[in-house]
Amino acid sequence: MSQTLQAVRGMNDILPDEAETWEHFEDIVRDWLKSYGYRPIRMPLVEPTPLFKRAIGEVTDIVEKEMYSFEDALNGEHLTLRPEGTASCVRAAIQHNLVAGHGPQRLYYHGPMFRHERPQKGRYRQFHQIGVEALGFAGPDIDAEHIIMCARLWDDLGLEDVSLEINSLGAAEERAQHRAALIAYLEQHRDKLDEDGQRRLYTNPLRILDTKNPDLQPVVEAAPRLADYLGDESRAHFDAVQLFLKDAGIPYRINHRLVRGLDYYNRTVFEWVTTRLGAQGTVCAGGRYDGLVAQLGGKPQPAAGFAMGVERLLALWQESGGEPERQAPDVYVVHLGEAAQRLAFQAAEALRGHGFSAVLHCGGGSFKSQMKKADGSGASIAVVIGEDEAAAGEVGVKPLRGPGGQQRVTLAALAEAVGGVLYSDQGDDDGGV
């Protein structure tokens, strides 16, 4: 007996009941994005490895530890399963001249991302993100729009206990001044740094401020703050974002240790967090990345965006009672005999042609067993075709969930009869015809 194969650890199957919930959630998200004028874009799952090294940063956990990378056996090209979407989206915009040729772009995407992490609750090796990118917008208004968009989605989903944290990372020269001061400070406390801190001291010291190590909290709490190195322009930008948020009635907390894990961010950064998902409490994060387009070889363009983890957001939504009811078919078609089976195919297609959902029974069985499956499907109506109906070119229409007996109608009158049963409660006798 051969060994049973299973999915890769940390990469999960999404089975039909759960997948229907995902689709319902995705419909809500698509409507929300379109209401703000964002348009879909789809990028490959596999990209050149240098794209992520250049965009995310060589000295980041993602690039150093978490990417699924391999060498193409055909041409030796180094490729990577995408660990995030922003770099791919910006690459596509540059390659196809979207911003330079067509002006500022509001774009969104959703799909799987891949990181080689230790699987745990809320953290997977294949996970799904919804990403939003605004390319070619320089002002604080787009930063605020992104945050306000999220607040509206939480309201649409009925989510509670999701709070906003914001910070400003300033401009490159301001971060450089702060970086020098931070390194000088941390050198005085080098003996207290853990292994990650020692490794990042000279390569990415800002990330030390984001440590979860409780022993390092006194050190990072007393560290120089980036806010003290911001120039007038960066301060004005951040102040304007806060003013928009206050006007929108969105509460927030300034978190001076919020730095994000990707090197391309500047100025505004934000996270929406919750305490209801355990340690993995971030459900959405983003900010401004004005230098990334030029960094990836395009004409310099300002940009901002955010991404949300679908698995975490779904868990929060379901915890808040957001899971939809299962969508049952309108009709289940049962049949007995060769002639009845042929007519059943015609009946099912006729109903689908009028906008009804219909499941055609396959696999044989008695009328009793087929009717049991019809009832179990949740369908509102069974269309019944036996030898007598088939000989007469007629079908039986039997309500399964409401009052009324079975009626026989011609194939031409089937859709009208089904509509009459389905919509009788609303007084719509011609529904679907």
Curated annotation (Swiss-Prot):
Catalytic reaction list: tRNA(His) + L-histidine + ATP = L-histidyl-tRNA(His) + AMP + diphosphate + H(+)
Alphabetical list of PANTHER family matching this protein: HISTIDINE--TRNA LIGASE, MITOCHONDRIAL-RELATED, HISTIDYL-TRNA SYNTHETASE
EC number: 6.1.1.21
Gene3D superfamilies: Anticodon-binding domain (3.40.50.800), Bira Bifunctional Protein, Domain 2 (3.30.930.10)
Protein name as annotated: Histidine--tRNA ligase
Subcellular location: Cytoplasm
EC main group: ligase
Gene Ontology BP annotations: histidyl-tRNA aminoacylation
Family: Belongs to the class-II aminoacyl-tRNA synthetase family.
Organism of derivation: Azoarcus sp. (strain BH72)
Keywords: Aminoacyl-tRNA synthetase, ATP-binding, Cytoplasm, Ligase, Nucleotide-binding, Protein biosynthesis
Annotated Pfam families: HGTP_anticodon (PF03129), tRNA-synt_His (PF13393)
Disulfide bonds: none
Subunit architecture: Homodimer.
GO CC terms, sorted: cytoplasm
Stretches assigned to coiled coil: none
Main localisation: cytoplasm
Gene Ontology MF: a single term: ATP binding
